[in-house]
């Protein structure tokens, strides 16, 4: 070790502790020094860590000049320690004596005499303490002992007899620490008293100081004071504080009441020594210091009567202060006290103590006098002026009087109106209609409402009507407290006022719980009526109990803390300044910091609750309380639950900023996310934008359109079809008489009539309509949408056009600059805590005038001038139907017009004041010939019903169906309308038609007027087609019978809907709709792991379904006497996962919402059966267009976000959580949470708030444990996609099956059987299905009859497990193929040209090993041409390789033969390939990384990187900052998200990055040049040590394992490093492994395999690496890389172009072999 290394290690040690020396003297010093320095001698004095070094001063001085550097490679740290010891001064003397030597008696006498003389001399100088001394007498060996004489001569000096090393060394260390501590504290006490540092004095006292030492220090302080009086210096002023504290402590024992004043003592914290050693104080003055926190231990000063704390920096007061029973005076002036209610502080000492006591005793005894006062009404009616008048603002009359032309640009303005009795929190809502959708989420029950209107407005009743109904609809069924306030009374006649009052009394007073003085007429200009209104508001606040008198005090503490953090008006120094708009950088910085406190995340909020003394079970109540009062805003939904808004005004400003933004392109209703900088730039931090978009979506201001980086803002759409929208509508939607009289049109539809509907409903519906597949939107506006319904042939054509467009866009993206994408990636990198990321990678969008939501047209525009430009030309090419009248063609065409009509006049008494109209037309065909229109009608009604049921509960809704007979007879007259319930009753009675009242003689077919009720897609079965057998089930819906189909005697289950006579109309409709919903969902599902629907029956309504013979999973698990085998359990898990994966891959995804063991049915318990488990019972299922909602039961199975979620929204990820519970149930046989016994309320709270989950058994396989824990994550976005789940379960199941084999034949048969092998490969195929799922809207299971096929088929990404399963055991299992092009015409693989040189039929998994040779040659792959393989990667059932000629080859993992070859679309040279989930990441020597989908064999993403030259990749699957790490020759390291492909982090090193490796513990080892860099992925900290390097050459490969890191170099050497701790490596070995560069290091169980360009591969035992097995046989050229295919199979890639791939079989254990010669491969859970 050279001197620089010694110095560096010494400095590192110095940073950890300070060395303190003990001078060891005497004949036995060598023994003492050797033994004591071998121990850990670290200890603490005060707050500093020391390490004792025992040394001989004379000897170190003598040897210091003779030290030489030692350059040996592996050297201990002793030399560095020794050099560091030279610089240490002795702080203690240790004299050693030989207890067997008589001379020791004389020697100790001489030393004692010398010590006494020294002590006497130093007593005169108290400032310099004497260095302590102690004796050690070594009494070891034979012979007489003189210990007793020596001890007698030692006198009072501490004495230790050394007999046994272990015991004596501990005693020596104990005496050493005591003496050194006493000595050091004496010095520091003297210093603290001398300089008057009370803070440090307190710290010393708290560390433990004897009373004698304190008295000595007190005496020294008196000496200083006395000296100052003699010399007239000011030292006495300096030591006043320290003297006072020491005096109080020293005199505390006399138990007399003392006073202590430490005023102006520069205290930075409360002296804790006071609470411990001054317990008899009666008065304590700590004023005018810098104390920031008062400790809870203040309660220990029981005698305290006066406590003066004014002029400090206190933010809070501990509740424990209430235990100071004698405290009479508490002075807290001039303290911030931001975290304690100011009103309580101002109420006096007695009330403050009582307040704190009530909180500790959990008493609800505080009064809350803050009341939310809501000002609502149209713009220009005087709301702001009324608020100012109530506030008592002294504005001029001209300012107070608001004219009708005044328009607010703020959505909500919040102010305070204070009064002695009550403090009103006034919310002034902007009256413009664009703000209306933003208001409803601010409206709460616990508030007073002022519905303000202008008395001079002739239509004031219509304005009042809307707001009264809006407030009522947001009151959760309660009656709100509404005051009707008319302004401008001064310009009205008494007659006008009387008429207005009569209108208000007759129509609106009934909606308010305020029965007296509800109506108020005021004049803000003169103040008339203002005082009376204010009195009435205060009276109502008291009467309605809005002034709360029984709330917990900790609510007030929490409110104080949050208000302090929030940016409330008047408290923010820069609240009015735009960010970046200040005059200085300092101002801008302050503004940014202020803005960040306008919201906090939920974890931070929980901490605030804890600091506010709230128990976990109290947090929800406190949150709801503050939310309802408008202090904070918090929405307990998956997207927003992590956000707590501290400043509602800020949130209102965010919404206003978007709605009132004046750019024309936003006014057209579409916001491009790339333009957000124009809206929010300089106002809101860019990292917050994705979360703001989600907030705006929650408040119905905008809707983020999936995957296209745009948002729809419905309130900014044109209200009516005007301009170009009107032109398109008039051209394509002919009048009803024209359509009917043409004789070529069939019409049907329905109306939804609402008594009231808040604004924003149609905007939410419009979003869902835009996402329905199989339609082509022609145009839409704020209250309507016109679309074409595509036939199946047109859907196929549409998908073809879409794929072409995507290819064009991908090509365009490759050619254009990606600046916008880079910018957005940077934005997201700053927002790692936000789960919602703006996806700006897609350039597709929606066209507002002519477009299809299923295709991806280019630009979006409403600008009339752009309709005829090139963009329109492109759009017209994408549209299936031309923009012409349907009457101009004879081809079939289906149309739908959906419009929302709101009430036009208050005087209208019609029930249909708000109407949603759906009209569907079929031209040149009938609904009997083409079901497209009927199926769409079912879909749209299902969508509407779901939206109404989930978000508009309590509204009065009637559904009416127009009579088509009336329409056909006279299209110009209003038709008769059938009631929806009458249609249901007719179907219930088996009647196929109704009779119109306008023409009772003509029957009207129900399937014509309400095709959604008849579900033409589902076959209808007659009673004589079914044979009933027995009842097998019963539920709330009705009965379930077992039966048979007459035609083929196949067994079925018949589920009947029984509607009782006692049930009301509403209940009957709800039950029927639930029945219809299940039929609708099941009619669109076709998968072997989902119960199949065969048909429908009527009178009563019945579903004929597939019969599943083995019952449900719940009852099977109850049979404890016959437990299910582990292999069968795995098969059940996989089957259920496949079924749910299929549901979630639908567009939109299906959310089951009731996944639990009773709804899982068992087809077979034979693990090799085609199907074992099926998902059933879709009565509660919904389609998820972003989210669904609704209150559910069975909370043990439900995701946290769905429990009690009547108004919350959630996604299909809720089913993922429930699936975790099913996995747990199958694994353990127990129900979820059976191990706990809580009440339901506590259960739900613990599941939602505390993350309670069932206990997974310890013997659960790690892979399954990981799947379960990921699936039941509390954060829905962290739950995995089912393609990952299927892959994990398939691999687990595949491993379990193969572990049972015991001989060659059985192994071969099992591995070749279709059921076993497909289980492992289907996951790869299914992984690929996710990418293209949105492009393939039809079911991806059209070939369900392949289960028993005798030929081997390729696994298509769009086909499921059971479809791909074959039962023939003689055929080879097909690999996970990227495309069906792998199959020849006969249905088998085209493999004639390719084979492994050793055997074309070899199964590599079963290759026999040579018992005497650890590395066994399998063969070389021969190909049809020469190829230079650049890189390779294992991809499940295939191995991918990339060649220099841009060829991409796919080889069978098990057979080793070439399956297929494709031409790569790019020509860049590949440097590395790795597998990441269902993707292959390909690094190149350019600046690009290509990401391939394993299923579709297409490039799904190209990443632009900062790398140059050779690029390496490493995949970190678990832990913090997981993802793909990349490094390049320029020295940059990047982390990429493995799902969104966005860059998350990056940093740079000095040298090229050549390799990376990760084992665990959040540690990534990076090879950079010749050095190893240790990088912590959790903290993003790295450590570089000059010792961690190769002495010659650079590092070319690196391998991290549990306790070791192996690094291979360009010189052929391998260095082995010991991992000492998380930031420290120690080189332990250097191996001369190869003669040239090491290209690969592969971990194989207990071995490490290396490859080199010297043509060799070497196998090292980790336990004994010095004796490797090396071979270069079969390698004609150097090994460039090694691909680990299985646990014991590796493929060596060489630079030889004729035999580039050499296959090797390597056992896990060299010595361990089975009886038949097959080495064990994997460990499995049984």
UniProtKB/Swiss-Prot annotation:
Amino-acid positions noted as binding GTP in the UniProt annotation, renumbered to this chain: 377-384, 428-432, 487-490
Catalytic activity: L-seryl-[protein] + ATP = O-phospho-L-seryl-[protein] + ADP + H(+); L-threonyl-[protein] + ATP = O-phospho-L-threonyl-[protein] + ADP + H(+)
Keywords: ATP-binding, GTP-binding, Kinase, Leucine-rich repeat, Nucleotide-binding, Repeat, Serine/threonine-protein kinase, Transferase, WD repeat
GO function terms (MF aspect): ATP binding; GTP binding; protein kinase activity; protein serine kinase activity; protein serine/threonine kinase activity; protein tyrosine kinase activity
COR domain residues: 591-787
GO cellular component: cytoplasm; cytosol; mitochondrion
WD repeats: 1422-1461, 1463-1502, 1506-1546, 1589-1627, 1633-1670, 1674-1714
Biological process according to GO: mitochondrial electron transport, NADH to ubiquinone; phototaxis; response to reactive oxygen species; signal transduction; sorocarp stalk development
Record-annotated Protein kinase domain positions: 1026-1292
The protein, known as: Probable serine/threonine-protein kinase roco4
Organism in which the protein naturally occurs: Dictyostelium discoideum
Protein encoded by which gene: roco4
């Amino acid at each position: 070790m050279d001197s620089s290394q010694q110095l560096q290690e010494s400095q590192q040690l110095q940073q950890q502790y300070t060395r303190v020396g003990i001078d060891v003297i005497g004949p036995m010093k060598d023994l003492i020094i050797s033994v004591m320095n071998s121990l850990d001698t670290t200890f603490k004095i005060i707050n500093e860590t020391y390490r004792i070094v025992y040394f001989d001063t004379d000897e170190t001085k003598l040897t210091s000049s003779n030290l030489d550097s030692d350059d040996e490679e592996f050297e201990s740290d002793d030399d560095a320690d020794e050099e560091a010891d030279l610089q240490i001064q002795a702080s203690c003397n240790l004299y050693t004596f030989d207890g067997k030597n008589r001379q020791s008696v004389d020697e100790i006498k001489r030393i004692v005499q010398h010590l006494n003389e020294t002590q006497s001399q130093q007593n005169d100088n108290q400032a310099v303490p004497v260095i302590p001394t102690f004796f050690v007498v070594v009494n070891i060996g034979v012979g007489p002992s003189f210990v007793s004489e020596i001890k007698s001569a030692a006198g009072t000096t501490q004495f230790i007899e050394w007999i046994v090393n272990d015991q004596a060394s501990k005693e020596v260390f104990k005496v050493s620490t005591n003496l050194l501590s006493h000595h050091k504290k004496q010095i520091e006490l003297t210093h603290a008293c001398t300089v008057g540092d009370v803070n440090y004095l307190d710290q010393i006292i708290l560390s433990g100081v004897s009373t004698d030492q304190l008295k000595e220090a007190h005496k020294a302080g008196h000496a200083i004071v006395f000296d100052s009086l003699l010399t007239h210096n000011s030292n006495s002023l300096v030591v006043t504080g320290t003297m006072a504290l020491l005096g109080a402590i020293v005199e505390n024992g006399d138990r007399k009441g003392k006073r202590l004043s430490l005023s102006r003592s520069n205290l930075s914290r409360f002296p804790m020594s006071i609470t411990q050693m001054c317990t008899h104080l009666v008065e304590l003055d700590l004023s005018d210091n810098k104390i920031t926190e008062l400790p809870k231990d203040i309660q220990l000063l029981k005698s305290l009567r006066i406590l003066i704390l004014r002029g400090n920096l206190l933010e809070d007061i501990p509740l424990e202060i209430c235990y100071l029973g004698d405290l009479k005076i508490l002075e807290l002036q001039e303290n911030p006290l931001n975290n304690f209610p100011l009103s309580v502080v101002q109420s006096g000492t007695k009330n403050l103590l009582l307040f704190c006591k009530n909180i500790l005793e959990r008493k609800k005894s505080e009064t809350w006098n803050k009341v939310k006062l809501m000002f609502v009404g149209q713009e220009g009616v005087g709301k702001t002026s009324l608020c100012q008048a109530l506030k008592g603002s002294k504005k001029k009359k001209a300012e107070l009087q608001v004219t009708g032309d005044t328009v607010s640009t703020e959505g909500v303005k919040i102010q305070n109106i204070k009064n002695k009795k009550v403090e009103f929190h006034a919310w002034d809502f902007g009256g413009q209609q664009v703000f209306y959708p933003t208001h409803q989420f601010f409206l709460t029950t616990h508030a007073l409402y002022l519905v303000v209107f202008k008395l001079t407005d002739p239509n004031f009743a219509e304005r009042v009507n809307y707001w009264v109904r809006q407030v009522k609809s947001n009151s959760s069924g309660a009656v709100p407290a509404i005051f009707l306030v008319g302004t401008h009374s001064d310009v009205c006649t008494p007659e006008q006022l009387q008429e207005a009052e009569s209108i208000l009394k007759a129509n609106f007073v009934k909606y308010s719980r305020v029965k007296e003085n509800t109506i108020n007429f005021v004049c803000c200009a003169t103040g008339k009526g203002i005082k009376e209104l204010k009195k009435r508001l205060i009276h109502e606040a008291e009467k309605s109990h809005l002034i709360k008198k029984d709330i917990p005090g900790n609510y007030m503490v929490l409110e104080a803390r949050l208000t302090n953090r929030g940016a409330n008006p008047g408290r923010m120094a820069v609240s009015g300044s735009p960010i970046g708009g200040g005059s200085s950088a300092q101002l801008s910085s302050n503004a940014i910091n202020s803005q960040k406190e306008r919201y906090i995340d939920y974890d931070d909020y929980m901490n605030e609750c804890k600091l506010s003394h709230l128990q976990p079970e109290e947090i929800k109540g406190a949150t709801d309380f503050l939310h309802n009062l408008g202090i904070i805003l918090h929405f307990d939904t998956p997207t927003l639950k992590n956000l707590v808004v501290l400043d509602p005004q800020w949130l209102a400003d965010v919404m206003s900023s978007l709605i009132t933004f004046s750019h024309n392109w936003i006014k057209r209703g579409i916001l491009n996310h790339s333009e957000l900088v124009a809206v929010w730039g300089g106002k809101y931090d860019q990292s917050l934008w994705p979360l703001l978009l989600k907030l705006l979506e929650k408040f119905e201001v905008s809707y983020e359109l999936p995957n296209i980086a745009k948002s729809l803002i419905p309130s900014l759409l044109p209200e009516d079809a005007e301009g170009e929208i009107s032109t398109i509508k008039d051209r394509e939607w002919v009048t009803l008489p024209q359509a009917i009289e043409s004789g070529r049109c069939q019409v049907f539809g329905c109306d939804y009539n609402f008594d009231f509907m808040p604004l924003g409903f149609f905007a939410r519906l419009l979003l869902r309509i835009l996402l329905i597949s199989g339609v082509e939107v022609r145009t839409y506006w704020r209250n309507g949408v016109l679309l074409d319904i595509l036939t199946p042939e047109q859907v196929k054509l549409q998908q073809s056009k879409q794929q072409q467009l995507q290819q064009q866009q991908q090509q365009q993206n490759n050619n254009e600059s990606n600046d916008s994408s880079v910018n957005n990636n940077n934005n997201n990198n700053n927002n790692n805590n936000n789960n919602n990321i703006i996806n700006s990678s897609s350039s597709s969008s929606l066209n507002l005038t002519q477009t299809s939501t299923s295709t991806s047209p280019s630009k979006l525009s409403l600008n009339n001038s752009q309709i005829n430009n090139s963009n329109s030309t492109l759009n017209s090419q994408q549209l299936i139907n031309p923009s012409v009248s349907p009457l101009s063609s004879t081809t079939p065409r289906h149309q739908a017009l959906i419009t929302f009509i709101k009430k036009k006049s208050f005087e209208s008494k019609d029930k249909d004041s708000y109407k949603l109209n759906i009209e569907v037309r079929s031209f040149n065909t009938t609904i009997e010939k083409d079901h497209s229109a009927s199926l769409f009608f079912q879909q749209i009604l299902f969508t509407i019903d779901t939206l109404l049921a989930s978000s508009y509960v309590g509204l009065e809704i009637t559904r009416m169906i127009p009579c088509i007979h009336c329409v056909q007879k006279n299209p110009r007259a209003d038709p008769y309308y059938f009631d929806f319930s009458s249609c249901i009753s007719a179907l219930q009675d088996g009647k196929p038609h109704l009779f119109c009242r306008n023409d009772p003689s003509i029957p009207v077919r129900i399937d014509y007027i309400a095709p959604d009720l008849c579900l033409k897609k589902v076959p209808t079965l007659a009673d004589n087609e079914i044979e009933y057998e027995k009842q097998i089930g019963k539920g709330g819906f009705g009965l379930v019978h077992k039966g048979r189909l007459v035609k083929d005697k196949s067994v079925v289950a018949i589920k009947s809907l029984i509607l009782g006579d006692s049930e009301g109309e509403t209940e009957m409709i709800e039950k029927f709709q639930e029945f219809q919903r299940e039929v609708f969902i099941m009619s669109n599902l076709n998968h072997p792991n989902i119960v199949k629907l065969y048909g429908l029956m009527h009178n009563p309504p019945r579903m004929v379904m597939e019969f599943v013979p083995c019952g449900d999973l719940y009852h099977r698990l109850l049979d404890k006497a016959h437990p299910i085998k582990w292999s069968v359990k795995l098969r059940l898990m996989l089957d259920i996962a496949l079924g749910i994966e299929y549901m979630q891959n639908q567009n939109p995804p299906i959310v089951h919402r009731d996944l639990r063991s009773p709804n899982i049915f068992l087809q077979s318990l034979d693990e090799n059966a085609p199907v074992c488990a099926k998902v059933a019972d879709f009565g509660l299922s919904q389609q998820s267009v972003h989210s669904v909602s609704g209150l559910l039961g069975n909370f043990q199975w439900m995701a946290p976000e769905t429990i009690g979620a009547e108004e919350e929204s959630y996604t299909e990820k809720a089913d993922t959580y429930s699936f975790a519970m099913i996995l747990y149930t199958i694994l353990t046989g127990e129900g979820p949470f059976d191990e706990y016994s809580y009440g339901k309320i506590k259960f739900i709270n613990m599941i939602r708030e505390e993350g309670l989950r069932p206990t997974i058994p310890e013997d659960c396989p790690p892979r399954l444990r990981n799947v379960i824990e990921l699936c039941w994550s509390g954060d829905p976005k962290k739950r995995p996609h089912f393609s990952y789940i299927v892959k994990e379960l398939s691999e687990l199941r595949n491993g379990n099956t193969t572990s049972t084999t015991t001989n060659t034949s059985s192994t071969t048969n099992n591995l070749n059987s279709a059921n076993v092998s497909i289980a492992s490969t289907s996951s790869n195929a299914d992984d690929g299905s996710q990418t293209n799922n949105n492009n393939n809207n039809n079911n991806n299971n059209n070939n369900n009859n392949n289960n028993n096929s005798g030929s081997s088929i390729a696994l298509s990404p769009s086909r499921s497990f059971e479809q791909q399963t074959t039962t023939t055991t003689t055929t080879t299992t097909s690999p996970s193929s990227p495309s069906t092009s792998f199959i020849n015409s006969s249905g088998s693989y085209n493999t004639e040209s390719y084979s492994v040189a050793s055997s074309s039929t070899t199964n590599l998994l079963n290759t026999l090993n040579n018992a005497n040779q650890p590395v066994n040659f399998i063969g070389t792959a021969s190909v049809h041409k020469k190829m230079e393989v650049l890189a390779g990667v294992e991809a499940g059932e295939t191995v991918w390789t990339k060649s220099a000629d841009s060829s991409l080859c796919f080889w069978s993992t098990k057979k080793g033969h070439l399956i297929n070859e494709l031409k790569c679309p790019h020509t860049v040279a590949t440097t590395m390939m790795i597998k990441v989930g269902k993707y292959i990441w390909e690094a190149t020597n350019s600046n690009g990384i290509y990401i391939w989908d394993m299923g579709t064999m297409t490039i799904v993403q190209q990443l632009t990187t900062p790398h140059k030259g050779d690029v390496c990749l490493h995949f970190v699957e678990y832990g913090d900052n997981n993802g793909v790490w990349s490094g390049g020759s320029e020295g940059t390291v990047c982390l990429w998200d493995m799902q969104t492909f966005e860059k998350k982090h990056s940093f740079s090193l000095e040298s090229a990055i050549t390799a990376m490796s990760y084992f665990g513990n959040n540690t990534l080892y990076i090879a950079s040049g010749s050095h190893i860099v240790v990088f912590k992925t959790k903290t993003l900290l790295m450590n570089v040590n000059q010792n961690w390097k190769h002495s010659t050459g650079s590092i070319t490969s690196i391998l991290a394992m549990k306790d070791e890191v192996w690094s291979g170099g360009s010189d052929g050497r391998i260095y082995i490093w010991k991992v000492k701790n998380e930031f420290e490596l120690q080189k332990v070995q250097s191996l001369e492994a190869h003669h040239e560069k090491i290209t690969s290091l592969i971990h194989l169980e207990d071995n490490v395999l290396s490859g080199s360009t010297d043509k060799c591969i070497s196998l090292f035992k980790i336990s004994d690496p010095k004796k490797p097995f090396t071979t270069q046989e079969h390698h004609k050229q150097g090994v460039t890389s090694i691909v680990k295919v299985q646990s014991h199979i590796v493929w060596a890639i060489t630079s030889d172009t004729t035999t580039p791939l050499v296959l090797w079989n390597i056992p896990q254990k060299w010595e361990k072999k089975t009886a038949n010669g097959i080495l064990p491969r994997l460990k499995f859970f049984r």
